Amino acid sequence: MKKLALALDVNDINQALEIVDEIQDKIIIKIGYNLFIKGGINFVKQIKDRGFDIFLDLKLHDIPNTVYNGVKAVSEIGVNYLTIHSLGGQEMIQQAVKAKEGTDLKILAVTILTSHDENYPKLLGSSLSVPDLAYRLADMAVSNGSDGIVCSSHEVKFLKEHIQKPFIAVVPGIRLTKEKTDDQTRIATPEEALRDGADIIVVGRPILKAEDRNKIIKEMLSVIEEL
């Protein structure tokens, strides 16, 4: 399993394709709903045809039948990973899992976004801490058939230690240093996330804004190999 995903968070389809064409190593490409809305299935296939695994980050969160139909449609276009939101509940997750039966699509349930801080559970009317809420959501998702979860590096070690069923842990908010420079509040370096149990790390701006993107990618792949 590839362990490095590039968050292709740009606004222009042509720019996105230029970046992908520049990349030498066949890593995972994460496509958010901005590019997916603009480029559609054809854009996904263009990336797929270049030899990359596709991580479609749509965070589906709707009534179970609607999510079932959405996942079914995604499963037919050769996507490797698709996100749903764990807050959608057990039945929604079960329907998402059912919809991709017979395919290689992996369902990843988002727990708590890395932009949220410790006040987030209170906004939901919960007295739980962020780690406890993340655990409740992750355990529920994995127990109902989700192949993996998306969580911050702050929770991944605890989740790996306490959720009994094996699962893929995807950790976004990866930065080259711990200095906070953007809207992500719960960040980690590649080394920290991987040591704590991340199976896939998602990196966006540190690669996209680099003068030499391939250099940064190779450095991260080297860290992955060492760990």
Swiss-Prot record:
<dbReference type="GO" id="GO:0006207">
    <property type="term" value="P:'de novo' pyrimidine nucleobase biosynthetic process"/>
</dbReference>
<comment type="subunit">
    <text>Homodimer.</text>
</comment>
<dbReference type="GO" id="GO:0044205">
    <property type="term" value="P:'de novo' UMP biosynthetic process"/>
</dbReference>
<dbReference type="InterPro" id="IPR018089">
    <property type="entry name" value="OMPdecase_AS"/>
</dbReference>
<protein>
    <recommendedName>
        <fullName>Orotidine 5'-phosphate decarboxylase</fullName>
        <ecNumber>4.1.1.23</ecNumber>
    </recommendedName>
</protein>
<feature type="binding site">
    <location>
        <position position="9"/>
    </location>
    <ligand>
        <name>substrate</name>
    </ligand>
</feature>
<keyword id="KW-0210">Decarboxylase</keyword>
<dbReference type="InterPro" id="IPR014732">
    <property type="entry name" value="OMPdecase"/>
</dbReference>
<feature type="binding site">
    <location>
        <position position="175"/>
    </location>
    <ligand>
        <name>substrate</name>
    </ligand>
</feature>
<keyword id="KW-0456">Lyase</keyword>
<feature type="binding site">
    <location>
        <position position="204"/>
    </location>
    <ligand>
        <name>substrate</name>
    </ligand>
</feature>
<feature type="binding site">
    <location>
        <position position="184"/>
    </location>
    <ligand>
        <name>substrate</name>
    </ligand>
</feature>
<feature type="binding site">
    <location>
        <position position="30"/>
    </location>
    <ligand>
        <name>substrate</name>
    </ligand>
</feature>
<feature type="active site" description="Proton donor">
    <location>
        <position position="59"/>
    </location>
</feature>
<dbReference type="InterPro" id="IPR011060">
    <property type="entry name" value="RibuloseP-bd_barrel"/>
</dbReference>
<comment type="similarity">
    <text>Belongs to the OMP decarboxylase family. Type 1 subfamily.</text>
</comment>
<dbReference type="InterPro" id="IPR047596">
    <property type="entry name" value="OMPdecase_bac"/>
</dbReference>
<keyword id="KW-0665">Pyrimidine biosynthesis</keyword>
<feature type="binding site">
    <location>
        <position position="205"/>
    </location>
    <ligand>
        <name>substrate</name>
    </ligand>
</feature>
<feature type="binding site">
    <location>
        <position position="114"/>
    </location>
    <ligand>
        <name>substrate</name>
    </ligand>
</feature>
<comment type="function">
    <text>Catalyzes the decarboxylation of orotidine 5'-monophosphate (OMP) to uridine 5'-monophosphate (UMP).</text>
</comment>
<dbReference type="Pfam" id="PF00215">
    <property type="entry name" value="OMPdecase"/>
</dbReference>
<dbReference type="InterPro" id="IPR013785">
    <property type="entry name" value="Aldolase_TIM"/>
</dbReference>
<comment type="pathway">
    <text>Pyrimidine metabolism; UMP biosynthesis via de novo pathway; UMP from orotate: step 2/2.</text>
</comment>
<dbReference type="GO" id="GO:0004590">
    <property type="term" value="F:orotidine-5'-phosphate decarboxylase activity"/>
</dbReference>
<dbReference type="GO" id="GO:0005829">
    <property type="term" value="C:cytosol"/>
</dbReference>
<feature type="binding site">
    <location>
        <begin position="57"/>
        <end position="66"/>
    </location>
    <ligand>
        <name>substrate</name>
    </ligand>
</feature>
<dbReference type="InterPro" id="IPR001754">
    <property type="entry name" value="OMPdeCOase_dom"/>
</dbReference>
